[in-house]
Regions:
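Extended, charged/polar low-complexity intrinsically disordered regions
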Residues: 68-298
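Phosphate-sensing "switch" segment of ASCE/P-loop ATPases
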Residues: 417-424, 429-536
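Intrinsically disordered, low-complexity proline-rich tandem-repeat tracts
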Residues: 20, 25, 31, 37, ...
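Amphipathic alpha-helical interaction surfaces
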Residues: 324-327, 531, 535-539
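Conserved ASCE/P-loop NTPase catalytic core
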Residues: 302-436, 441-445, 459
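Cationic, low-complexity basic patches in intrinsically disordered or flexible, solvent-exposed regions
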Residues: 47
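Extended acidic low-complexity intrinsically disordered regions
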Residues: 2-17, 21, 39, 61, ...
Length: 543
């Protein structure tokens, strides 16, 4: 029988996810904006005292990124030293445990095809220090964890066998659970480890509710118990000539509770929650430019290489992540890293490569079961169409449904009227100078014919980001300084989506009779997200 206390078995690394972050003092005042309310504290994570287990498995991931940002990372020179600046010192002081050196991210990303937010969470745990020796030791620990414990889809059967042979094995994978209300159990499954659904202990669901909300990357110790021998109704083992007949008569359908796999321990390697109020409280220690630079560095960019206008263009790319039902269009030259924010920074955004999808995939199936009733717009915070020239819908009503959704945040499918919050981003390339394009056509020309001349569709876009004003990605645009781990940044954006400040615009602005509702909506929608991202000081009192 398996002994769970066997010293030869690997243990999950001791990671303390319950260390509270000290709340910073009150937020300084900014004339035109008032403050945002508190949210619970972000648990800071401390590095484990012991070395990472040799059997921990790293999470399976998508194919290597081919976007322009990733190309710039691959071409970046090796770092031969690190010089801290004043902003680095402030981040170490006020966001310890939730920051990482972005040059280390680029270094690790070259050899580890792991989600950036998972990689940076590990870097934040083991390398959030200015001690170079400790950083080097932390990097080796992370490499070992990812090498030994990361579950790759093509190695799933090998990992399953290892769990069986050892009795217990530690893995890194994304786990998702849902409640089976008829059996009163939580049924879980992995993203990459192909085992049948199993029972998730209720305490983990209570502690980490994100397991129920799309899943969470975790370090988990998985146990295996050998199934009991099947017995007949008299308690005798089934064998001989009667075995097939009697076994078939007695056989019952197996469920999650019959799975030989079970979770012995679970530790998130994503932020399980974020204290928005504590993060906003730290804003008072940063000037407007420092806060702006911190956001850019957190996304991987070096602000000292950008002009003021370029910095704001990069910040604008974040707006769909913090504002619900926001429609952004960015068209410009190739190689400006349009998709990086939505592909690598936020796990709540989905990038549709080639821009192709179906009406059912995007907006759900008509009159279907609840699980399929809402499409991508109901499951993601941001849906990004990459290469808008490739947008194609076989359903002729798709464009009308999309226009309805972009205008109101709701749409009709069959008998149902469905509401959703996802923002939409449209990206594409302009292969000529703006001057030449304007001589023959218009700036929405890259869109396909069914959209190209539809003014009602373009009227629903809140912001047109001029991609020709953004520099092409190069190695010098990649920061080597400290920034928030991308998971912290994405959770900040996620929490900010829950807040609505648009009704406070009347306290600071008056619109004359020339503004209709569409004009008003197009001004308000980009205004407050940009205020929140760049100022944020005194938004507490606004509520």
């Amino acid at each position: 029988m398996f002994d769970s206390h066997d010293d030869d078995l690997w243990e999950v690394p001791s990671i303390d996810v319950n260390v509270p972050v000290e709340a910073a003092p009150a937020v300084e005042t900014v004339p035109a904006v008032e403050t945002v309310p508190a949210v619970e504290n972000v648990p800071a994570v401390e590095p484990a005292e012991t070395a990472a287990p040799a059997d921990a498995v790293a999470p399976a991931e998508d194919e290597p990124s081919t976007d322009d940002y990733a190309q710039a990372v691959a071409e970046a020179p090796e770092d031969d030293g690190y010089d801290m600046d004043g902003l680095d010192g402030k981040l170490l002081e006020h966001f310890g445990g939730k920051i990482v050196r972005k040059d280390l991210t680029a270094l690790m990303k070259r050899g580890a095809n792991v989600p950036t937010f998972v990689l940076e969470y590990l870097l934040g745990m083991y390398c959030s220090t200015d001690d170079e020796d400790a950083v080097a030791e932390g990097l080796e620990r992370i490499r070992k964890i990812l090498t030994d414990n990361y579950v790759r889809p093509d190695e799933s059967e090998r990992i399953k066998s290892k769990i069986r042979e050892l009795g217990r094995f530690t893995i890194i994978d994304k786990v998702t659970a849902k409640l089976d209300e008829y059996k009163d159990i939580y049924v879980a499954s992995f993203a990459n480890l192909t085992i049948e659904p199993f029972v998730m202990p209720a305490e983990y669901v209570r502690d980490y509710s994100k397991i129920l909300q799309g899943g969470i990357w975790c370090i988990m110790s998985i146990e295996y118990r050998h199934p009991m021998e099947e017995e007949d109704e008299f308690g005798m083992e089934v064998f001989g000539d009667d075995a097939p007949r009697r076994s078939k008569a007695k056989r019952k359908k197996r469920g999650p509770e019959d799975s030989p796999f079970s979770v012995a321990s679970l530790t998130p390697i994503q932020m399980p929650n974020l204290d928005l109020d504590a993060m906003i409280d730290e804003r008072q220690y940063f000037s407007r430019d420092e806060w702006l630079n911190m956001l850019l560095r957190s996304a991987g960019y070096e602000p000292s290489e950008l002009s003021e206008k370029e910095r704001l263009h990069f910040i604008e790319r974040m707006v769909p992540l913090i504002e619900r039902n926001y429609n952004l269009c960015e068209l410009g030259p190739r190689g400006t890293g349009k998709s990086h924010i939505y592909k690598e920074v936020s796990p709540y955004a989905i990038l549709l490569s080639g821009g192709q999808t179906t009406t059912a995939n995007l907006f759900g199936r008509m009159n279907s079961m609840r699980a399929d009733r809402v499409g991508l717009v109901g499951h993601w915070d941001c849906v990004t169409f990459d290469e808008v020239a490739g947008m194609r819908f076989k359903d002729t009503n798709a464009v009308q449904i999309m226009k309805d959704y972009m205008a109101s945040g709701s749409y009709a499918r069959g008998r149902d009227q469905i509401n959703a919050d996802a923002s939409m981003v449209f990206e594409g390339n302009i292969n000529d100078t703006v001057q030449n394009v304007l001589k023959t056509t218009h700036l929405f020309d890259p869109f396909p014919p069914e959209f190209n001349n539809d003014s009602a569709f373009f009227d629903r876009i809140h912001y047109y980001l001029p991609g020709w004003e953004i520099p092409k990605m190069r190695s010098s645009l990649l920061t080597g300084h400290y920034g928030l781990i991308t998971d912290c940044l994405s959770e900040f954006c996620k929490e900010m989506r829950r807040k609505d400040f648009t009704h406070h615009i009347d306290r600071y602005f008056r619109f004359n009779s020339d503004f209709n509702w569409c004009n008003f909506n197009h001004i308000v929608s980009p205004f407050f997200p940009l205020i929140l991202l760049t100022l944020l000081n005194n938004v507490h009192n606004v509520l």
